[in-house]
Regions:
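Exposed, low-structure sequence patches enriched in small/polar residues
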Residues: 1-246
Length: 246
Protein backbone atom coordinates (compact mmCIF):
# COMPACT_ATOMS: atom_id res chain seq x y z
CA UNK A 1 0.00 0.00 0.00
CA UNK A 2 1.73 3.17 -1.24
CA UNK A 3 -0.11 6.47 -0.72
CA UNK A 4 -0.48 8.78 -3.72
CA UNK A 5 1.60 11.45 -1.98
CA UNK A 6 4.31 9.07 -0.69
CA UNK A 7 7.83 10.38 -1.34
CA UNK A 8 9.98 7.60 -2.82
CA UNK A 9 13.38 9.31 -3.08
CA UNK A 10 15.42 6.17 -2.37
CA UNK A 11 12.86 3.36 -2.22
CA UNK A 12 12.68 0.45 -4.63
CA UNK A 13 10.00 -1.76 -3.12
CA UNK A 14 7.85 -4.29 -4.97
CA UNK A 15 5.00 -2.91 -7.04
CA UNK A 16 3.44 -2.53 -10.47
CA UNK A 17 4.47 1.10 -10.84
CA UNK A 18 8.06 2.07 -11.52
CA UNK A 19 7.82 4.31 -8.45
CA UNK A 20 6.51 3.47 -4.99
CA UNK A 21 3.47 5.76 -4.80
CA UNK A 22 -0.23 5.82 -5.72
CA UNK A 23 -0.70 2.05 -5.60
CA UNK A 24 -2.49 -0.65 -3.62
CA UNK A 25 -2.23 -4.30 -4.48
CA UNK A 26 -2.17 -7.98 -3.60
CA UNK A 27 0.37 -10.49 -4.94
CA UNK A 28 0.10 -14.26 -4.46
CA UNK A 29 2.60 -16.73 -5.92
CA UNK A 30 3.20 -20.48 -5.65
CA UNK A 31 5.64 -23.12 -6.89
CA UNK A 32 4.85 -26.85 -6.73
CA UNK A 33 6.40 -30.10 -7.93
CA UNK A 34 3.26 -31.83 -9.16
CA UNK A 35 5.00 -34.92 -10.65
CA UNK A 36 8.58 -36.25 -10.53
CA UNK A 37 9.58 -34.38 -13.72
CA UNK A 38 7.02 -31.56 -13.71
CA UNK A 39 7.06 -28.27 -11.82
CA UNK A 40 4.16 -25.81 -11.91
CA UNK A 41 4.68 -22.16 -10.95
CA UNK A 42 2.38 -19.17 -11.04
CA UNK A 43 1.25 -15.93 -9.51
CA UNK A 44 -1.69 -13.54 -9.41
CA UNK A 45 -1.18 -9.81 -8.98
CA UNK A 46 -4.07 -7.39 -8.45
CA UNK A 47 -3.27 -3.68 -8.36
CA UNK A 48 -5.24 -0.46 -7.90
CA UNK A 49 -4.15 3.11 -8.57
CA UNK A 50 -6.27 5.46 -6.39
CA UNK A 51 -5.25 8.53 -8.37
CA UNK A 52 -4.20 9.56 -11.89
CA UNK A 53 -0.97 8.29 -13.42
CA UNK A 54 0.91 8.50 -16.72
CA UNK A 55 -1.47 7.87 -19.66
CA UNK A 56 -4.28 7.02 -17.22
CA UNK A 57 -6.46 10.06 -16.49
CA UNK A 58 -8.62 8.46 -13.78
CA UNK A 59 -8.31 6.04 -10.86
CA UNK A 60 -7.91 2.52 -12.24
CA UNK A 61 -7.57 -1.16 -11.42
CA UNK A 62 -5.86 -4.04 -13.23
CA UNK A 63 -4.41 -7.51 -12.82
CA UNK A 64 -1.51 -9.64 -13.99
CA UNK A 65 -1.41 -13.43 -13.92
CA UNK A 66 1.31 -15.88 -14.85
CA UNK A 67 1.55 -19.67 -15.13
CA UNK A 68 4.48 -21.84 -16.19
CA UNK A 69 4.84 -25.61 -16.50
CA UNK A 70 8.38 -27.02 -16.54
CA UNK A 71 9.22 -30.49 -17.81
CA UNK A 72 12.70 -31.99 -17.32
CA UNK A 73 12.79 -35.48 -18.87
CA UNK A 74 16.58 -35.84 -18.50
CA UNK A 75 19.47 -33.93 -16.96
CA UNK A 76 20.37 -32.53 -20.38
CA UNK A 77 16.88 -31.48 -21.55
CA UNK A 78 14.60 -28.87 -20.02
CA UNK A 79 11.48 -27.33 -21.50
CA UNK A 80 8.66 -25.09 -20.34
CA UNK A 81 5.41 -23.55 -21.51
CA UNK A 82 4.42 -20.15 -20.14
CA UNK A 83 1.39 -17.90 -20.38
CA UNK A 84 1.15 -14.41 -18.96
CA UNK A 85 -1.72 -11.94 -19.22
CA UNK A 86 -1.79 -8.34 -18.03
CA UNK A 87 -4.90 -6.19 -18.16
CA UNK A 88 -4.89 -2.54 -17.15
CA UNK A 89 -6.91 0.52 -18.19
CA UNK A 90 -5.28 3.22 -20.34
CA UNK A 91 -6.48 6.41 -21.98
CA UNK A 92 -8.28 5.96 -25.26
CA UNK A 93 -6.86 7.88 -28.24
CA UNK A 94 -10.34 9.31 -28.80
CA UNK A 95 -11.42 12.34 -26.77
CA UNK A 96 -15.12 12.82 -26.00
CA UNK A 97 -16.27 16.24 -24.75
CA UNK A 98 -12.63 17.12 -24.03
CA UNK A 99 -12.36 14.22 -21.61
CA UNK A 100 -10.06 11.22 -21.86
CA UNK A 101 -11.87 8.05 -20.87
CA UNK A 102 -10.33 4.68 -20.04
CA UNK A 103 -10.42 1.44 -21.98
CA UNK A 104 -8.93 -1.93 -21.05
CA UNK A 105 -5.61 -2.87 -22.65
CA UNK A 106 -4.92 -6.61 -22.57
CA UNK A 107 -1.51 -8.05 -23.46
CA UNK A 108 -0.96 -11.83 -23.44
CA UNK A 109 2.29 -13.73 -24.00
CA UNK A 110 2.52 -17.43 -24.90
CA UNK A 111 6.02 -18.93 -24.80
CA UNK A 112 7.53 -22.37 -25.43
CA UNK A 113 11.21 -22.83 -24.62
CA UNK A 114 13.50 -25.87 -24.99
CA UNK A 115 17.12 -26.10 -23.87
CA UNK A 116 19.28 -29.16 -24.36
CA UNK A 117 22.95 -30.03 -23.98
CA UNK A 118 24.46 -32.25 -26.68
CA UNK A 119 27.55 -32.77 -24.51
CA UNK A 120 29.73 -30.82 -22.09
CA UNK A 121 30.79 -28.41 -24.86
CA UNK A 122 27.63 -27.67 -26.84
CA UNK A 123 24.31 -26.35 -25.57
CA UNK A 124 21.28 -25.25 -27.61
CA UNK A 125 18.19 -23.19 -26.79
CA UNK A 126 15.07 -22.82 -28.96
CA UNK A 127 12.22 -20.44 -28.21
CA UNK A 128 9.00 -19.41 -29.89
CA UNK A 129 6.75 -16.72 -28.41
CA UNK A 130 3.41 -15.27 -29.49
CA UNK A 131 2.10 -11.91 -28.29
CA UNK A 132 -1.47 -10.62 -28.59
CA UNK A 133 -2.56 -7.09 -27.71
CA UNK A 134 -6.08 -5.68 -27.63
CA UNK A 135 -7.07 -2.16 -26.60
CA UNK A 136 -10.76 -1.41 -26.14
CA UNK A 137 -12.81 -2.20 -29.23
CA UNK A 138 -9.82 -2.05 -31.57
CA UNK A 139 -8.74 -5.13 -33.48
CA UNK A 140 -6.26 -7.48 -31.83
CA UNK A 141 -2.67 -7.02 -32.97
CA UNK A 142 -0.23 -9.92 -32.90
CA UNK A 143 3.49 -10.45 -32.77
CA UNK A 144 5.89 -13.36 -32.66
CA UNK A 145 9.55 -14.10 -32.10
CA UNK A 146 11.59 -17.23 -32.78
CA UNK A 147 15.24 -17.71 -31.95
CA UNK A 148 17.98 -20.31 -31.81
CA UNK A 149 20.85 -20.01 -29.33
CA UNK A 150 24.12 -21.90 -29.61
CA UNK A 151 26.56 -21.99 -26.70
CA UNK A 152 30.04 -23.46 -27.12
CA UNK A 153 32.66 -23.96 -24.42
CA UNK A 154 35.63 -26.05 -25.62
CA UNK A 155 37.36 -28.34 -23.19
CA UNK A 156 40.79 -27.28 -22.03
CA UNK A 157 40.28 -23.62 -23.01
CA UNK A 158 39.05 -20.71 -20.91
CA UNK A 159 36.87 -19.64 -23.82
CA UNK A 160 33.10 -19.45 -24.30
CA UNK A 161 31.06 -18.42 -27.34
CA UNK A 162 27.34 -17.62 -27.44
CA UNK A 163 25.47 -16.84 -30.67
CA UNK A 164 21.82 -16.22 -31.53
CA UNK A 165 19.76 -15.92 -34.69
CA UNK A 166 16.26 -14.52 -34.30
CA UNK A 167 13.21 -13.79 -36.46
CA UNK A 168 10.50 -11.37 -35.34
CA UNK A 169 7.32 -9.81 -36.71
CA UNK A 170 4.72 -7.57 -35.04
CA UNK A 171 1.59 -5.89 -36.35
CA UNK A 172 1.96 -2.87 -34.07
CA UNK A 173 4.32 -1.29 -31.57
CA UNK A 174 1.98 -2.39 -28.77
CA UNK A 175 2.62 -6.02 -29.76
CA UNK A 176 6.41 -5.54 -29.56
CA UNK A 177 8.58 -8.43 -28.37
CA UNK A 178 11.19 -8.38 -25.60
CA UNK A 179 14.16 -10.74 -25.42
CA UNK A 180 17.00 -11.04 -22.93
CA UNK A 181 20.45 -11.08 -24.55
CA UNK A 182 23.78 -12.14 -23.10
CA UNK A 183 26.14 -9.19 -22.86
CA UNK A 184 29.60 -8.24 -21.68
CA UNK A 185 30.38 -8.15 -17.99
CA UNK A 186 28.32 -5.65 -15.94
CA UNK A 187 26.10 -4.82 -18.94
CA UNK A 188 22.39 -5.65 -19.11
CA UNK A 189 20.55 -6.06 -22.41
CA UNK A 190 16.78 -6.60 -22.80
CA UNK A 191 15.95 -4.98 -26.15
CA UNK A 192 12.51 -4.95 -27.74
CA UNK A 193 11.58 -5.18 -31.40
CA UNK A 194 8.64 -4.16 -33.57
CA UNK A 195 8.01 -4.43 -37.30
CA UNK A 196 9.49 -7.31 -39.26
CA UNK A 197 13.05 -8.51 -39.47
CA UNK A 198 15.82 -10.64 -38.03
CA UNK A 199 18.63 -10.22 -35.53
CA UNK A 200 21.99 -11.82 -34.87
CA UNK A 201 24.42 -11.44 -32.01
CA UNK A 202 27.61 -13.18 -30.90
CA UNK A 203 29.43 -12.90 -27.59
CA UNK A 204 32.97 -14.17 -26.98
CA UNK A 205 34.57 -14.39 -23.55
CA UNK A 206 38.18 -15.39 -22.92
CA UNK A 207 39.82 -15.60 -19.51
CA UNK A 208 43.47 -14.59 -19.90
CA UNK A 209 44.25 -15.23 -16.23
CA UNK A 210 42.53 -14.90 -12.88
CA UNK A 211 42.71 -11.11 -13.08
CA UNK A 212 42.03 -10.41 -16.77
CA UNK A 213 39.05 -11.32 -18.97
CA UNK A 214 38.35 -10.26 -22.53
CA UNK A 215 34.80 -9.70 -23.83
CA UNK A 216 33.76 -9.03 -27.42
CA UNK A 217 30.15 -8.63 -28.58
CA UNK A 218 28.62 -7.86 -31.96
CA UNK A 219 24.91 -7.54 -32.81
CA UNK A 220 23.00 -6.59 -35.95
CA UNK A 221 19.29 -6.11 -36.62
CA UNK A 222 17.94 -6.39 -40.16
CA UNK A 223 14.59 -4.74 -40.93
CA UNK A 224 12.45 -5.75 -43.90
CA UNK A 225 11.44 -2.13 -44.50
CA UNK A 226 14.18 0.50 -44.91
CA UNK A 227 14.35 3.82 -43.05
CA UNK A 228 12.37 2.66 -40.04
CA UNK A 229 11.86 4.40 -36.71
CA UNK A 230 12.58 2.46 -33.54
CA UNK A 231 12.25 3.32 -29.87
CA UNK A 232 15.54 3.02 -28.02
CA UNK A 233 16.02 1.78 -24.45
CA UNK A 234 16.23 5.41 -23.30
CA UNK A 235 12.74 6.06 -24.70
CA UNK A 236 13.79 8.32 -27.58
CA UNK A 237 13.04 7.77 -31.25
CA UNK A 238 15.95 6.63 -33.39
CA UNK A 239 15.98 6.57 -37.20
CA UNK A 240 17.60 3.69 -39.03
CA UNK A 241 18.80 4.86 -42.44
CA UNK A 242 18.62 1.78 -44.60
CA UNK A 243 17.50 -1.52 -43.14
CA UNK A 244 20.38 -2.56 -40.85
CA UNK A 245 21.40 -1.47 -37.39
CA UNK A 246 24.61 -2.78 -35.80
Amino acid sequence: NYAKDFQYAKSAAFGENYNNSNEKGLFIGANAKILPKFVLAGYFDSFTFPWLKYQVSAPSHGFDYFAQLNYTPTKSIDMYFRIRTKLKPVNTPEVVDRIDYLVDANRTNYRFNVSYAANSQWKFVNRVELITYKKGDAATSNGYVFFQDVKYKPQGLKLSIIARYMLFQTESFDARVYTYENDVMYANSIPFFSGKGSRFFALVNYEVNRNIELWVRYAQTYFTNPNVFILTNSGSLDTVIGNKKS
